């Protein structure tokens, strides 16, 4: 199949995927879009939202519709790296046998990742970067495609271990989850308080998703779009030649080169989903918020004046 035909097919399948997910998840289109963009771009996503907004249900539904294996890990202060990666046990012949942990799935929901100490966080983050884990000196490759969706509760900060900036940078998207609108919540209550069973049909399989990820990487990008993405990222860096006074006043730290790479990858996926054979500047703008918001560090002045990351990104766009 030619790449042109494959992109046309992807447009149709992506529309079907969204309508399949909408059978169970009401509203939240932007969030679902960003998660799907992240999966097809080969990245990971961080979901920031208060409890009770159907994060687990959303990820479970998306994994069913994609035909992928799904595991949920609840992060707690006493969780150990072996609880995620797996461990070696003695079998009946007194030989060591490796028992795989929950990380050996296609889609991992790392629930409340900031509740566990850095030692355990880094075990998951290594697997995100390397797509492999090392246990007792032996390296095990993970099943592909591999996608981590980590959640964080922005309200409770007691007893949490905030993710360091270097680890946050490994997430392609930071997705902000808001409360549903009044009409959406009415629909949610109607749907969840009856005895009807809704089934989600798988539309893809693991190999198809890997093929689409390769297809997206093959999409060509013109130089001016790459230069625009890199200039956007450069504008977030205070005290550099491209930084405006607004950035110098309100930011301590800007985004690194990984942000530029992710902007282009996500823009390619966004373009493919809309039937375009090459991304333009509008595609970069469409994905900029989700890719930059967790990579810029505000200073005390911005906190005091209640300026959000999205406000800052709006000024550079």
What name fits each language-model region?
Residues 1, 239-317:
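C-terminal engagement/docking regions of AAA+ P-loop ATPases
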Residues 7-11, 24, 174-246, 273-277, ...:
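Conserved C-terminal "switch" segment of AAA+ ATPases
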Residues 8-53:
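Pre-Walker A (pre-P-loop) alpha-helix and adjacent loop at the N terminus of AAA/AAA+ ATPase modules
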Residues 34-37, 88-109:
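Conserved alpha-helical scaffold flanking the Walker A/P-loop in AAA+ ATPase domains
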Residues 39-76:
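Walker A/P-loop
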Residues 97-106, 135-152, 163-172:
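AAA+/SF3 P-loop NTPase mechanochemical coupling elements
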């Amino acid at each position: 199949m030619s790449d042109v035909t494959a992109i046309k097919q992807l447009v149709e399948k992506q529309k079907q995927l969204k309508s399949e997910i909408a059978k169970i998840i009401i509203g939240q289109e932007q969030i679902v879009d960003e998660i799907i963009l992240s999966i097809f771009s080969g990245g990971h996503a961080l979901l920031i939202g208060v409890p009770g907004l159907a994060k687990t249900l959303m990820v479970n539904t998306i994994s069913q519709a994609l035909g992928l294996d799904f595991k949920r890990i609840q992060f707690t202060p006493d969780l150990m790296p072996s609880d995620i990666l797996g461990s070696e046990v003695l079998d009946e012949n007194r030989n060591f046998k490796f028992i795989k942990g929950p990380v050996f799935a296609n889609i991992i929901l790392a629930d409340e990742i900031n509740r566990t100490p850095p030692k355990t966080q880094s075990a998951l983050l290594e697997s995100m970067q390397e797509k492999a884990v090392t246990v007792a000196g032996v390296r095990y490759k993970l099943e592909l495609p591999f996608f981590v969706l980590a959640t964080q509760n922005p309200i409770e900060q007691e007893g949490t271990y905030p993710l360091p900036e270097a680890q946050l940078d490994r997430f392609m998207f930071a997705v902000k989850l808001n409360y549903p609108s009044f009409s959406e919540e009415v629909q949610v209550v109607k749907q969840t308080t009856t005895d009807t069973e809704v089934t989600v049909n798988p539309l893809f399989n693991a190999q198809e998703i890997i093929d689409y990820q390769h297809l997206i990487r093959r999409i060509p990008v013109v130089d001016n779009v790459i230069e625009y993405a890199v200039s956007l990222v450069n504008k977030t860096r205070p005290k550099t030649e491209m930084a405006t006074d607004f950035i110098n006043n309100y930011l301590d730290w800007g985004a690194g080169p990984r942000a530029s790479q992710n902007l282009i990858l996500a823009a390619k996926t966004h373009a493919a989903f809309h039937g375009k054979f090459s991304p333009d500047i509008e595609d970069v703008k469409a994905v900029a918020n989700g890719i930059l918001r967790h990579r810029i560090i505000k200073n005390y002045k911005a906190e005091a004046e209640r300026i959000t990351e999205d406000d800052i990104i709006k000024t550079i766009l």
